[in-house]
Amino acid sequence: MEGQSLLMAGLLYLCAAVIAVPLAARLGIGAVLGYLLAGIAIGPWGLGFISDVQEILHFSELGVVFLMFIIGLELKPSKLWELRRSIFGVGAAQVLLSAAVLGGLLWLTDFSWQAAIIGGIGLAMSSTAMALQLMRDKAMNRNESGQLGFSVLLFQDLAVIPALALVPLLAGSDSGHTDWMKLGMKVLAFAGMLVGGRYLLRPIFRFIAASGVREVFTAAALLLVLGSALFMEALGLSMALGTFIAGILLAESEYRHELEIAIDPFKGLLLGLFFISVGMALNLGVLYTHILEILAGVVMLVTVKTAVLYLLARIYGLRSSERLQFSGVLSQGGEFAFVLFSAASSTSLFSGDQMPLLLVTVTLSMMTTPLLMQGVDKILKHRFNEVDDSQEKPFVEDDKPQVIVVGFGRFGQVVARLLMANEKRITVLERDISAVSLMRSYGYKVYYGDATQLELLRAAGAETAQSLVIACNGPEDAMAIVHLCQQHFPHLQILARARGRVEAHELLQAGVTQFSRETFSSALELGRKTLMSLGMHPHQAFRAQQHFRRLDMRMLRALMPNHGDSQQISRVKEARRELEDIFQAELRHEKRQFDGWDEAD
């Protein structure tokens, strides 16, 4: 029966999401708000299909965990070091200022000073899941406001630890005494995780990838995320912080893109479940009986946080067109409030209906954010269509690749080296793990992964790249990549390697006109030198080479519709006679006209 109830719950979540999210998108209110409304509909205060909300809410936090892992993969340690001032400067200022103002307002009501401190800290936190999702939807991750927003969220995650430790101290319980031995063991365990992750993760994934079984690689990625999350929870730290660190440790590895596409589907589903769970947790009974106090609390919360964030963004020097986005996307309460307020309630810091009032306020504030961001978008369209003042800080430079090279064998290496020598930004994808390990040992930026997977191409930057070079060995894979890019990334210029005429025909039929037959050019070059060794003048040998190249391409195009047809033989004979006639004409016309070609190259 328990298994059946679990299946029924899963079916309800899927049905709610499938119905509510498209409707929300049709109404223009966004997918996040659609998930929240779906949760209200099926929760205990809606149709009552789901009653155990807290258990589901705890499980759905894995969505935030997976999201933080992917963000860690995208953030190299060097980049994190560059953000240290915004993390510990703007992030710390936001938490302290917001907590002071909101806590002071709570103290002016019926809250004790201890409860006001915890309430202010909890309300100062923003929703990591909602903010990061909205930042991605609004493409804020490409500019400075997104980086600053991420810095604030990261500091909030770090602030979880001292905030939870503060609860028993304010409650005056015996548990407020610090167990230094236990604390030291936790610090050592955390340091062990960092060292072990730094030196063991790559060899482990190299061993797994060598098996060539994609499902095992996905299982290993899930094991890493869940294992690091549970390890951090056992230490009393944030699960999301643990997976974020694991992601950073692998950010510069060759497995980054493959890990991202392995985790991304789970992240999306669990994030949706998280938002549904938040909607289910909304206590409509408390809302109905205290509607005026709660609405006033939501307005107070959103207004104070927006004002504090806008002020900090201005001091930081953020572009005027980004301040509203930055302050709006972080204006809500967050999922950490549920944890902190529950801990405070267990020590009797809150009295009466204070805790449910705060939780409903936080939940409603999360529901206002998608609507608030729509309003921000409308304001920006009217006010900031023109270029900002030259004194303002420029957009962060986009480091997306200009070219994606698929395959790093002998052929792909030459192409990639030429591009890098000319300072072009490239990303190289290779599925042979031994080749990846070897090339990275020489300093090449090569990533392990199967480029026939749509999400890998997307993670590698195909949506913003200008060109894609297909230099892989397998013709089936090459054609699969061509069709995938033509369907999902039509802006890409596709340049491909063809092993022979058959592959060249297939590429032409698929609409790829820029290709190179891997042995053709080198064979032509050797043929030219052979002609010169027989006494032909360099100029004449070069012209013969170019004539042959043009005629061969004409033959290739002419024979393409009849590939495998009986007419092919006669067409080849006709082309050979045409080539002989051209050479004879060249000999008669260009005899002794070889100025500047006396030296062979």
From Swiss-Prot:
Membrane topology: Multi-pass membrane protein
The organism's place on the tree of life at top rank: Bacteria
Main localization, broad class: membrane
Record bears the keyword Transmembrane helix: yes
Alphabetic keyword roster: Antiport, Cell inner membrane, Cell membrane, Ion transport, Membrane, Potassium, Potassium transport, Transmembrane, Transmembrane helix, Transport
GO biological processes: proton transmembrane transport
Transmembrane intervals: 5-25, 29-49, 55-75, 87-107, 115-135, 152-172, 180-202, 207-227, 230-250, 268-288, 291-311, 324-344, 356-376
A Pfam family matched in the record: Na_H_Exchanger
Keyword Transport: yes
Subcellular location: Cell inner membrane
Domain RCK N-terminal: from-to ranges: 400-519
Any single GO CC term annotated in Swiss-Prot or TrEMBL for this entry: plasma membrane
Record-level Gene Ontology MF annotations: glutathione-regulated potassium exporter activity
Subunit structure comment from the entry: Interacts with the regulatory subunit KefG.
Sequence similarity: Belongs to the monovalent cation:proton antiporter 2 (CPA2) transporter (TC 2.A.37) family. KefB subfamily.
Function: Pore-forming subunit of a potassium efflux system that confers protection against electrophiles. Catalyzes K(+)/H(+) antiport.
Identification of the protein by name: Glutathione-regulated potassium-efflux system protein KefB
Organism of origin: Erwinia tasmaniensis (strain DSM 17950 / CFBP 7177 / CIP 109463 / NCPPB 4357 / Et1/99)
Organism taxonomic ancestry: Bacteria, Pseudomonadati, Pseudomonadota, Gammaproteobacteria, Enterobacterales
